[in-house]
Amino acid sequence: MPAKYTLRYLTLVTNSTIAAELRPSTWSPLRHATFRALWIAGLVSDFGAWMHEVGEAWLMTSLSPSPLLVALLTSADSLAIFLFSLPAGALADVLDRRRLAIFTQVWLLVAALTLAVLTYEGAMTPWLLISLSFVMSIGAAVDAPVWQAIVPDLIPRDELPQAVALGGVSINIARAVAPALGGLIIASIGPYAVFLFNAITFFYVIAVLARWRPRSAKANLPPERLLGAVQSGLRYARNSPELLAVFFRTGVALFASSCLLALLPVLARRELSLGSTGYGLLYGCMGAGALLSVALLPTLRAKLSEDATLAAGSIVFASVLVTLSLLHNAWLAGGAILIGGVAWLAMLSSLNVGVQTATPSWVRARVLSIYMIVFQAAIALGGLVWGTLAERRSLRMAFLAAGAAMLVGTLVGRKWFRLSGRAPDFSPSLHWPKPVLVRQPGAEDGPVMVTFDYQVPAENQKRFIRAAKRLEPLRRRSGAYQWDLYRDPSKKDRFVETYIVDSWADHLRQHERLTVEERNAEARVRKLLLAGTSALVTHLVEVDAETELKAEPADQD
């Protein structure tokens, strides 16, 4: 699976998407003109992308017989996404998404056109190809969260699952057909032709985006600063056990499966003696398997949990890796890869469901960027490891080791990192009252300490401490970078909860981010308080003494 071009799809999957049954309503988002135009543009771009991917991989096998260099092509793609995805997610949450999307399409257009010209002129080298692939992946890293954030603005909320399902259909139609088509073009014209076709597809996407005029909503608060937005995304993910489990399972699945993704060109050319057309057909088997999975997954999901679906897909994919290490027949290899495509989508859909259902909308682009970082870091590391193993030992050894790694990782994940299958209630609660102030802080004034003063009877104090401790990850996820619980030794029943956020604007954002889950957690704390009392809330804004003193005349002695 190409690292550069599947990211848009990864960021759009929800719990009712890939495995969604193709009900008539699945097509309903196409009634909306802007969504329809962008969906068609995406389909055209997907065809160009998969053809481009086949061209890159085949060109590298022509430039160098080294399995390591072929694998490094995948690793370079993943490294770019690893480095740039999180800042890109923050940008998608705070900048004009339409302009950012147009910028990324222009970036990708220029990079693809450069690759086409240099290949046509015979000036391409292995390391230049890796470098240009890295440059294109930077554009893809920025593009993915932008598309994720755009789609909900194009359609009614109740049609979002169907819209995302259509995104999956687009990707997998292209993945099933485009590699074989790309192989035919490479065989008849040359790799430069598929690079040129890919560049041309970006013109259409740019034209559609240029015509789109999104609805602009007036923001009540200034946009987050880039660094602060990145930090809040990391803080949210770090304090979500559900997300940490998804990230571990993603790392395991992608590290092992990257063996097939990175070394398929070597398998096709060296072990199966295929040309570019045969390689394209072999690549297309993975996409055909993924399309087949769309029909099979609803039945599977009706019987298995997300965690069990992930485990089943992982075991089947591990079996495919082991099988490919033993095969020398192209037809049998194609059948195995077809089954691998089914298993791949079963794994991917379960992971995507896990990350989407564990993330509220305000931080979704950033969390999905972290997910993509884990995704691509695992592919990059795996490509390096399996490519090195194939070069120093054998291709068979690399596939066997990858299959074993998948099985071991699945067992560890099932034991300690299970997908909960529980979707937290992220419905806005807005249950905090507006602070009563005699002096209005500036948006960037801070840090701000918020305190909750509790009175707790002795018989409830242990239960209170446990309940209050459960508030810590919720406070941190909504913006706090420090949280503490204090006991007053001068009073038998007084406890004080404190947390600190960067600025007054960040605290006001917390008010907007409150969910039913947090309201319920706070209600459990309140039940343990002294009868007739409630939490006393105060807000303390740090004094910038230098600024305050400059604003007032000096005191006269």
Regions found by a protein language model. Give the residues of each.
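Short, well-ordered beta-strand segments in beta-rich or mixed alpha/beta enzyme
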Residues: 389, 448-455, 484-513
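Alpha-helical transmembrane-bundle signature of multi-pass membrane transport and export proteins
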Residues: 4-418
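Short, highly charged, low-complexity non-transmembrane loops/tails of multi-pass membrane proteins
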Residues: 424-438
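Short amphipathic alpha-helical segments
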Residues: 459-483
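A short beta-turn/loop motif at secondary-structure boundaries
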Residues: 486-492, 529, 541-543
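Short, intrinsically disordered terminal tails adjacent to the first/last structured region
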Residues: 1-21, 436-447, 466-469, 473, ...
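Short beta-strand/turn micro-motifs at beta-sheet edges
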Residues: 58, 435-443, 484-486
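An amphipathic, aromatic/His-enriched active-site/gating alpha helix that lines ligand/cofactor pockets
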Residues: 419-422, 473-482, 500-537
